[in-house]
């Protein structure tokens, strides 16, 4: 094990295509642009409905052009540019209609407000022959890449158990629009973990789920969620989120854990703890050895979910465009499968549990 190589970074494209931004809100400010700067990607232009914000972002991040209309951006966009769309889910269809056919687009998740809208988005992308991916960037967080590296090398054997547990305090007041979103926690947070589970475990046959409100945020349609994925009688997969643990850092938890026939991996997601300051990530793995007590090994992870994962989601699209990979991992078609699981979780929560007789 001393010579074990654990990959942590996403593979970059050979060619760096210019990027143009549609929408420059908090996620772009805090993650997209820091990631692109770190990778060496160039943002050629941007547009936001808030003109003042757009020009401020252009000045801060040395973007050469801030356009006052989407139409103006489209006309002036280089022919080989990637459209980086970070707008509310309800606005995705309207934006895609205005993007020229046969162009490359990276769309901020979720893929619409619901499964039906997701299907409309996929149909439009196919009609316009867009090379379209969804920014499910958690797949490319350094600790996730490290876990996949170990699993693909067979280090922990066959994975039969995957668990995501989040017990943190999330200041939902930072995103007031979520008060208007049905099943907000599932659609805007647990969707990360649903997509991650699919990426590692494949397609579940069904879902058991319940999302509940919390007395502190009754206006929000769900802030704590339990999801059980049905992968048959041998694999256990679940997601548990409690965003209202307001009792200090001591008992906060935020991790992804994989257990296999030969070992296990546990990755701490420090970003979500003590939010928005965060805590350091941590990565450990254990490999069983005959006749020996289990030993957990610690790996120093370089980089974090925000912003480093956003390098990976953009890189995978660029690599597909340049032809260095044959499959687009987070294509809109694949993302629609994640939306189908999200929809099933919402339906399960609404449908309720099996009633107890007596």
Q: For each of these PLM feature ranges, what is it?
A:
Residues 1-15, 81-85, 316-358:
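C-terminal helix-rich "cap/oligomerization" subdomain common to oxidoreductases
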Residues 27, 302-315:
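Active-site loop of classical SDR/Rossmann-like NAD(P)-dependent oxidoreductases
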Residues 138-219, 225-226, 352:
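Predominantly a Rossmann-like dinucleotide-binding segment in NAD(P)-dependent oxidoreductases
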